[in-house]
Amino acid sequence: MNIKTIKKIILPLFFLIIAIIFTNAGNSYSGTKKIITLKDALTLAVKLYPGILTSKYSYLSSVYTKNETLSQYYPQVSATAGYSKNSFMNVDNNIVTSNGRIITEPGINYSLNDYSASLNATYMLYSFGSRYYNYLNAKYQMKGANAGYNYAVNSDLYNVILNFAEYFADKELMKADKENIKNDEIQYKAAEAFYKVGTGDLLDAETAKATMETAKAAYINSIFSVRIARLALLNSIGLPPSKNYVFVNTLRFKPFKSKLKGLIKSAVKNNPQLKQALYAVKAAKASVKQSVSGYYPTFNANFSYTGENSAFPLNRNYSAGLSVSIPIFNGFLTKNKIDYSKAALNSSIWNKKLTESNLIYGVSSDYYALNNQYLTVKALKSSEKASKLAYTLAFKSYEVGVGSMVQLVTANAQYISALTSYINGRYTYFYLKAKLYSDLGLIPEHYLK
């Protein structure tokens, strides 16, 4: 075998090996799993969820709007420069001789350059509050937008917690359905065995089989419920529907020990919706005062420098002075602005009262619902243990020929029902707790710190 033949064989094999290595490396990289706890999910949502980012940039735009109003506190300076060339064509060219005769020569053409420059400055000296209340209005609107951003964070993070709890609830319910199938299969095999040896009847075997098939259908449904819940969780975080994310259940069932009075006080202080309503009232008050200032004059200082000539240096002129602008009549515009601002203020005041009342009611309801759910879950846990024991006893009784298939099926159904209720109750407690912290406006403080 010569060298050329060896090269023809070895080189393709070499490139094939390289391709396989890179392919495996790519598959290994793409298959890397990212572990996500509840805290991780919430942190990612703050960075990725479109609803939160929308509110964030809406708040930032209000910051720049507020900064725009500060421009009235600075001189407004502008400068212009110009150049033009004027041409004159076929201008009469008459010449007077010494003896008084006028001789007309052919017309002449000529042009003149025109240079100009100007610098103008205006500064508002006093405006009877118009400038200040315009700034104050924008400032409170900015603070309201910040509260709106915090409200979006609390609301969207609550949805993440809700979807997180529902996902793991559905996973546990799927396990319960799988256990139900296992129990039903054992029951069916036992009933069929008794029937074959003549100690049982066909009805028991068929009843057990029908129960088993129903359990299989429920299990299939629970599998897809888990998949849908996972998609909902990923969407609420702002992540794509990828299999590379592995969620880890970090929820812990603990009693809630805070007192209602302290919770209401905390909610009134921290709830972003109430803050938003409060800043809306303050902004509306500033708007009323700004509208009233429309009846008063404004004082300005003016300065200008101009230069103009057909050649350099330019002929320069300076001008400086004070001016006052006095409103006399504007078609009742100022009056209508005041009436509108006062109506908007009253609307904001009543909206604040409504928001505060709803907040106190909501926090109180959350508090009682959470405590009720905690006690309910403890009772459901006891029920689940008792029903599991009852099923075990019923199965043993059936095995020795004392119990009936009806008792066994009933006991298993009661056990699975109790287990399902316990799972649902426990995860309901988790998102009721999140709902309370959302109304308090403290989800980031409680879950992310």
Please state what every model-predicted region is.
Residues L53, Q76-N94, P106-L112, T122-Y151, ...:
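Small/polar (Gly/Ser/Thr/Ala-rich) solvent-exposed segments
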Residues T54-T69, A152, D156-K178, I186, ...:
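Amphipathic alpha-helical coiled-coil segments
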Residues P12-T23:
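Bacterial N-terminal signal peptides
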Residues Y29-G31, L38, S87, P241, ...:
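Acidic, low-complexity, intrinsically disordered peripheral segments
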Residues L42-L48, S98-R101, L239-A301, H446-K449:
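Amphipathic alpha-helical coiled-coil scaffold segments and their short linker/junction regions
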Residues N24-T43, K47, S58, Y447:
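Sec-dependent signal peptide cleavage junction
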Residues M1-K8, I36, D40, S155-S266, ...:
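Periplasmic alpha-helical coiled-coil/stalk elements that build and connect Gram-negative outer-membrane
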